[in-house]
Amino acid sequence: MAQARNSRIKVGIVGGTGYTGVELLRLLSQHPDVELTAITSRKEDGLPVAEMYPNLRGHVKLAFSAPEKASLTDCDVVFFATPHGVAMAQAQALTAAGTRVIDLAADFRLQDTASFERWYKMPHGCPDILAKQSAYGLVELNRAAIAQAQVIGNPGCYPTTVILGLAPLLERKLIDTQALIADCKSGVSGAGRKAEVASLFSEASDNFKAYGVAGHRHHPEITEQLEKLAGGKVGLTFVPHLVPMIRGMFSTIYARILPEARETDFQALFEERYAGEAFIDVMPAGSLPETRSVRASNNLRIAVQRPGNGDQLIVLVVQDNLVKGAAGQAVQNMNLMFGLPETTGLNQVAILP
């Protein structure tokens, strides 16, 4: 495991103009052990970051720079808040220089390169790094590997909720692995900061719709991790929805209890599994989570319900898709990689109303 440092961690961000990029900036600008040294954007080269994002005035004094101008190999770690394919094109040079990489896109999430190529329509650029130097960045399940890795594939937002919602059940083999359902809702910020008809206010406001029902890129990521936990194939129906809020995610997960597991105390199971996890809150029995209770925080809340004490178990999970579902989780990974307490720079309380 990386040892705690005497100096601040030199951090670069590639792709700092999107929603996950600015969320990284918000969190890292308040991190006591971080020195922001480079924030790249080819389009915004020379523009002060605070001019694009006024909330960062007085906190981030850097200007965006074109990628070729930034000395990324001088950084201790570089975050990629970029489209798929960008991080893997630069990972070889960065890791060769001793710089660690945390990718918030999908380049290092899937270990199966054939699956990656099928879903993302591009060949994998560095399969050797993927196989030998990378780790899937879901800290609560993968601490040892993350601490040693040179490259982290930061999990997708939907996968974070579904995997953590099912992990205690799959680890103990308590549910039918062929009958899993994940009914998930995300705020529109999950679509990114780009001009797109579906994200326009007139399209997204007062509207609720499903998308990606025939196949979503997060499906293979979820199933790959669930199958590791289950020790075999799983059958998952995953349906994402877009809801008219800016940030937040609510996943309702359905699982059928196996006959031999009917006497299990599922509330106690979840409480014990996540005891001591700083960012996972298993709510009291009978409680129901709300997205606003985690807004702008790195917390993920879980509630477990068993209607009528029957054979159907319902796991309800909420998170902020931009924080625990993206930038906050990435900072949590960085903390672990550099021997810091996982909570460093991530103790923000959710904002209300």
UniProtKB/Swiss-Prot annotation:
InterPro entries: AGPR_AS, AGPR_type-1, NAD(P)-bd_dom_sf, NAGSA_dehydrogenase, Semialdehyde_DH_NAD-bd. Pathway: Amino-acid biosynthesis; L-arginine biosynthesis; N(2)-acetyl-L-ornithine from L-glutamate: step 3/4. It is found in: Cytoplasm. The active site is at C157. Pfam families: Semialdhyde_dh, Semialdhyde_dhC_1. The keyword Transmembrane does not apply. It catalyses: N-acetyl-L-glutamate 5-semialdehyde + phosphate + NADP(+) = N-acetyl-L-glutamyl 5-phosphate + NADPH + H(+). Keywords: Amino-acid biosynthesis, Arginine biosynthesis, Cytoplasm, NADP, Oxidoreductase. Its EC number is 1.2.1.38. GO terms for molecular function: N-acetyl-gamma-glutamyl-phosphate reductase activity; NAD binding; NADP+ binding. GO terms for cellular component: cytoplasm. One of its GO terms (biological process) is L-arginine biosynthetic process. Catalyzes the NADPH-dependent reduction of N-acetyl-5-glutamyl phosphate to yield N-acetyl-L-glutamate 5-semialdehyde. Belongs to the NAGSA dehydrogenase family. Type 1 subfamily. This is N-acetyl-gamma-glutamyl-phosphate reductase. The lineage of its organism: Bacteria, Pseudomonadati, Pseudomonadota, Betaproteobacteria, Burkholderiales. The gene is argC.
